[in-house]
Structure formats: structure tokens, C-alpha cells
């Protein structure tokens, strides 16, 4: 053992041992309890960032701990390799997306290995490889045959100059990212998967996930958005047209003063045929893409169509308006507006001078000022014919009954969730395995012709997908007759929705999954990833698992039992203002700081001496140039130090503030551990531990060791409070460095303590512990060592201090042995007097 701790000498050697001996290879073993630990796979963007490092370090700590407690652990890694950034990078770097992607994978794989993560690399999955997406294509054709896939027209962003579809990310302030042309909204045919068929199950099964964060489950419940209401049919005056609307508040039905429809609604387009002003308004509204989250705050705009809808119960006519706050793809694309009892309807009615009819009164009978706001709470019905004086629940049922009896309405459960649009008009994705024959029939690509291979050796011009630009690529045959292949590709969420299952059998070629292997390893025992994925990836992930179950491939209901959402990594951000009033962000690694006595930054300068503005701790990002390169940190401090800081600086679910001073502190701590083991190894114990012969001080030290073992075991295993586990080990180390090594029992207690410390640190800092384990005289490697178990008897204190109070005042403090025989009152009095 070297006297000085030198991670650059230790870590590559240990990593080579792991690789050559395939130490972390996972093999199905029905005699052992399995444990599948999975971190969300990365997009191969070129370099790891600190968010990756935090995620994967948490996963590795969990995996190594679970191996030590005797479980058969699977921890794989792969690449979510399709996606839009590769197309932009290909154009910028004059290369093909495939080449750029594969080079990035190799580089990032080296970075992961440098950090010492215990992956089974034999199970590596790369989603842009045809052996992976072949089975995704096959499964899509099976879903189509089951009626779970369909094609319909849907709205996309269209650049008229480039004549191409743009992803939302390619639209900057309403214009094309490439040519700055105003973007239009266009209707084109797209493929959808019926996730709505599973909406109820996706909602109710959230109750079966007690180890998922409540915040994620709440976000999914809101996204699925189950509501109970009534669909009501209005007739259009002077025509045979009908207008269905859905409402969760039938109790307000008598307060309807207008009906609002989406710009894309067929009635709107019909009304605009002879109304140029309305046609222009509709065109403008269609081309203004509005996120649902913005609907509440955006300016409400509308225009009367000239049409009137007939109220089914009163027979009165109410005007039909086109409104920009109604979206065609939500509900029926039309809403009954009750301005007196809905804030959005109220705002619109006030702007355009529409009627406000009160039909709900507060339950306490108080008056409401409708000149200021709508009354949106439940209450008692007024101005509602025979339904007056009913409360919400009574009115809901009574009005629904009446509408159903008249056959102009029906009770209905609605979901906010929409079917999953999986078509992308991009190149770098898996081709959708559908064809259109020369007579217009849409058919699936037969199994024997799968995969539909995406050509990788292409030239990107930044305008159109190479497979759309090449008419020859689409040409094929079906039953000996000419046909055309679909040129859209899959949404990349498709690949990331089932990769976790493919890890269980990545070399299986007889089908999508080997059910025996998949059902042994699944569900995932611990999934780790950011909460930003709550309503997209994590929902599709659950949906796909249910599809695989219903296809008879899997036998579980949910893909992951436990979910941990790690917090973001923050770093200081600094900038100066250029002569053109532009903020120029300077990397924290280039900044010289002055701090006050409390450690607060009081001055920051860049290498040119410019004084910088400190904008605080913000999420690491390219835009603020405050990302810290993990590779630089590993080269400077060592992988174990970076891992230790990541696990110690903050609870796993909370944001982590990157402080290089904290990294330096982590390095110093590991140096202290190394030094103590080195000191012990120069004069190790030669006698076995004799508990009966221990002195009081030796027993106290041993008690501290085993109390720490118990705490760390609980913190890492059950509570997953890794930072408090590390704090406990640090506290123990403070005591161990002060402990004497004067006799054989001192050394024996120290030997036991150091063996425990090294094993407790191993999941977090595996390289240094690999070396220290051998320095302590162990012949096997620590990778196969069992977790240290606390000795209950060692934690029992010999004496307890008993405080005796009389009339609330402390009279005496008496030390009592744990096995103290019962005392008579006379003996107790005597002790109190001495």
C-alpha cells in the first residue's frame, strides 16, 4: 500500500480489473432474490453533464449496496440514440447523424467507465440500432391489428419556405429556426396509439405505487384528468347541424349565454365561408400555437359566427362565437359558456358585452358582485326553473336525468389525456412500419420484411428528411404490387418506453422479449430520473408496460416498484454586459472570487480583470455557461471524490449546489481514511478481538462503530438518505483518528472498525475501498464482500445516567449499570447521599 492517496493511480487499475473479470455481469438465478436498479438512459449528446453524474451515482450506490446484502443485481446502461439534436449537429458539422451519434456514444461510454459505475456492459442497448427498433416496429404492427393504432389528421408546425414540418423546439417566437419565416399551423395525417383506452387503468393503478413520489403521482393524475360530466347537444338554429358540448357543471346550465367553439371546429369553417373577416380571424387563431398552460393568462379573443345554438331546456337562442381559448383537440372543441360562474367565460363576456346570467347563489344566501368576478363555487340553484333550490349534487343528477330523458344529453366520463401522436416528420428516428398500396389501402409491413431500415449514410441539408427527399426510398411492393412506405418516423418516446424491458434480454433474437428473462427481472425495483419526465416518459413507460402485459409478454402491471427523482445540480453563474448590451456569461471555472467572513461572494472577476455580476446559483446550462465538466473534475480530484461529494452535498431529491470547496473537502476526507488504514497496516493486530477483555474506552469506541453501522444500513437501505449516512461515517472517522493503538485490543477494535468503514464507504467510493480492503489483509475482493452487520450486543451501554428530580428540581444524577440488581429504597437513599 502506498503511503499517499493517489486516485489517478488507483482508479484505472481497479476499473481494468472490473472490466477484465466482468465483475458486474448479471445472470438470472432463481435461488437468489433479484434486484433491478435502473437510471434513465441518456441521450448521447457528446459529453456527460453533472446531472447525469448525480443520477448515475445514486443508482450505483443503490446497486452496490444491494449486491452486498446478497441480492442478484442487474444494473444496465444504454443510449436513447434517436432524436432531433443529431440532425442539427449533422448539418452544423457536415456529417451524418448516425456517425455523430456513434462517436458520442463511444466518448460518453468512456466517461461512464471513468466514474466507476458497476454496469453490466454486455447488456448495453442502443436504440438507433436496427436490432432494437425492429421489435418496436413489429409491436406497432401488432397494436394496429388489435385496433390500438389509427391515423388521423392533426395540426403541425409548417415552414412554408422550407416546405417542411418543424418540431416545437424549432419554432422560435413564431418563426422557423433556420430561415426565420413565420410558421403556419397545418393539418396533416399522423399516426396515434390509443393511450386513452388505458386512461382509467393508468389512473387507478397509481394507487398501487406507494413508493413513487406523491408529486409525480399527482402530476400524472392531473395530466390524465378524469372528470365526470354531461355531454349536451345543442341544435343550430335554421339548420340540421348539431353542436355537442361537454360540461362538468350541468348545475349552471340555465346560465348559458353563448357557446364558444375552436377555430378549427367544422362549424367555424362553415360560418367563415361567406365571412372574410371571420375567415381571417380563424386563420390567425389557427397559426397562433397556444400551450394549454397559457390559456388561463393569455388575452381572450373571439368573433361571432352569426350562428345561434338552441338551448335544449329553455328553447332560447344563444350566439355561437369562435374563441381562441377553446382547443379543438380537447373535449368536443366547443364549450357552453356561463359567464356568471366561470372566470374565463366571465372575462370573455365582459370584453365583448355578452350576457351574464346568475343561476348559482352562495349557500349562505349572500349577494355576489358580478361586476367584479364570476362566482365559481358550488351553491344553490336560482333562475333555473324546476331545479331552483337544489344543491350541486342534486342539480347535477336532476338535470342530467332530464337531458337523458329528452335524448339531448348523456352522462359521460371524460379524460384530459389525448391519444399519443407518434408520427414525426423527421429523419433520425425509427421508420413507421406501414405502407400504402397503389389502390390506397393502408397495410402493415409484414414480419418477414422487418425491420424497415433507416439508411444511415445520408447527407443532411437541414431542410427535408433524406427519406422524404428520396422518392426511391419509399418504393416497395405488397403482394407483388407497388406500394409506398411511410416516410414519417416514430416519436423518440417510443424507444424510451420499453428499453428497460429489453435490457433483460438484449441478445434475444426470437422475439421482442424473452418472457422468462423479462419476468424474472421485472418490474424494476428502483428507477431513478428527473421529475421533469413525470407526465411524458413516465406515463408512456407505464402505458407500454401494460401493452406488453396485454400482449402476453409480461406478467406484471407496472414497470417500476420504486421511483426516486433526483434534484437538479446548480452552480454559480456570472456575466458581464457587452457594449451592445448583451450578457456574456463566464464559466465559474474562469472566475476569481473574493468572499466575506461568512463565505458570501463579494467580488468576482474574469481572467481579463473585468468585474462580473453574480446572478446566483442556477441550474447548470449551456445558455449560462455554468456547467462543470465531470471529466475535468475526475481528472483533478478522482472519481471517488466526485461521487462522494455528489452523495454528501444534498439529499438525493433536493437540488445540489456545486461548490468546489466541498469537492476539496471530500478529497481531504478520503485522504484521512487512506492515512488511517495506512497507519494501521504498518502495525496491524495480531490477536483476535476479545470482547470480554475490552476496557471501558474500547467498548465505547466499538459501540460507536456498531451504532454507525446500524444507522448507515438504515440510511442507505430503507431511507435512502445517503448524505446522512456519509455524515455518520465522517463522525465515526473523527473518533477513530483519535483512538489509541497502544495494545492488541486497541488494534483489534480498530481492525473491526476499519473493516466496517471501508465496507460502508464502498458503494459510494468503490475504487479507494477496493484498495483499502486488500490493505486490511483480505484475500478476496471487496466486490464480493458482504455488507457489515451491526452487533446488537455491542450497542448496549454498560451504564445509563438516571436523573432524580424532587418537586421538579434535579437532586442527583446516578450512573446505573444495565444489569443493575433491584435496589431497596434504603440503598437508593444511601447512594443519593454519597
UniProtKB/Swiss-Prot annotation:
Enzyme class: ligase
Alphabetized GO MF terms: aminoacyl-tRNA deacylase activity; ATP binding; leucine-tRNA ligase activity
Family according to the record: Belongs to the class-I aminoacyl-tRNA synthetase family.
Catalytic reactions on record: tRNA(Leu) + L-leucine + ATP = L-leucyl-tRNA(Leu) + AMP + diphosphate
Keyword Nucleotide-binding: yes
Renumbered ranges of motif 'HIGH' region: 42-52
EC numbers, comma separated: 6.1.1.4
Localisation per UniProt entry: Cytoplasm
UniProt-recorded name of the protein: Leucine--tRNA ligase
SUPFAM superfamilies documented for this protein: Anticodon-binding domain of a subclass of class I aminoacyl-tRNA synthetases (SSF47323), Nucleotidylyl transferase (SSF52374), ValRS/IleRS/LeuRS editing domain (SSF50677)
GO annotation (BP), single: leucyl-tRNA aminoacylation
Motif 'KMSKS' region boundaries: 619-623
Coiled coil start-end: none
PANTHER family in UniProt: LEUCINE--TRNA LIGASE, MITOCHONDRIAL (PTHR43740:SF2), LEUCYL-TRNA SYNTHETASE (PTHR43740)
Pfam families in alphabetical order: Anticodon_1, tRNA-synt_1, tRNA-synt_1_2, tRNA-synt_1g
